[in-house]
Amino acid sequence: MLDRTTAPLIKDPIHFNFELPAINTYALSNGVPLYWLHAGVLDVVEINWIFEAGIWQEPLQGVANATAALLKNGTTTQTAKQINEQLELYGASLKIGASNDYASITLHCLVKHVPAILPTIASI
């Protein structure tokens, strides 16, 4: 049984060696900055697109969230069903949302499927 009338001894935190991976930068031909890092040995990737299009930039209340919600509802070249079927075919996950400061699109998939999925994301 623990004696809760006396405080436990204070111990030093466990020592560990923590190093962040190097962040690489690149500018695309259209001037958009690209940042990436190699974070491990798994063949999975997370790609984030960040846009200055959050709630603070919306002309009317609700526009940012409504726009984010509509992005997966089809494009001029693909229906919502086609987009979802392609993501499902490759086991990919796509999250689209808006916050106060920005809107974002996040893709999770296997590295080998990126070339097949990117055209769909570009059409969105």
Predicted regions, residues:
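His/Glu-rich zincin catalytic helix
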Residues: M1-Q86, T106-C109, P119
